[in-house]
Design a protein with these regions (language model features):
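Active-site histidine-anchored catalytic micro-motif
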Residues: 2-179
Length: 179
């Protein structure tokens, strides 16, 4: 893939946020962790040095992926199709429980994709001291700029091609499955 570089020699990357653990916030009143909108700009992106990357955040939904259904997945697909017309790589923030399912759903339905679409999430919410969110987002941003068109999951320093990936709940990460 040839990256679309703008007039300032920067690369545009689109981040579509859907919720999941990566975006959960702690409610001091009742002690719960809830999806209440995106905070990726303040919690991660503002801390990264990305002088040659223009990030465009598209907040789509704010849901725990366990509560996503095919209507939500269809909305994610439609948003990918719409945003991909801008010819910029796409990163999807998604809950890990159904990330592989959503990625495969989109892989099966979007046939003329011209950009890389990289799904990522976290086991521990951003904003928590031992979060894996910063690592996973940083790696997904770089992967989106380097990979060819197609669907991928980027997680814990690994890139997995969709649909050959699944979550390993025991190891608390993702792993490749046979082609």
């Amino acid at each position: 893939m040839t990256l679309k570089i703008n007039e300032k020699n920067n690369v545009d990357v689109i981040i579509i946020t859907t919720g999941g653990t990566i975006e959960k916030t702690y409610d001091e009143f009742d002690g719960s962790l809830e999806n209440r909108g995106t905070s990726i700009k303040n919690r991660i992106l503002s801390k990264l040095r990305l002088p040659y990357t223009n990030i465009h955040v598209h907040p789509l939904m704010s849901k725990d992926s366990l509560y996503m259904d095919d209507q939500d997945r269809a909305e994610i697909c439609q948003t990918i199709e719409s945003e991909s017309q801008k010819k910029a790589p796409i990163v999807i923030l998604h809950g890990t429980d159904t990330m592989a399912l959503t990625a495969q759903y989109c892989f099966e339905r979007i046939k003329n994709l011209e950009v890389p679409v990289v799904f990522t999430g976290a086991m521990i919410p951003m904003g928590f001291e031992d979060t894996d969110a910063t690592q996973n987002v940083t790696e997904a941003l770089l992967a989106a700029k380097l990979l060819s068109k197609g669907f991928y999951i980027s997680f814990h320093n690994q890139i997995f091609e969709v649909p050959f990936v699944r979550k390993n709940k025991e190891k608390r990460t993702f792993e490749a499955i046979s082609k």
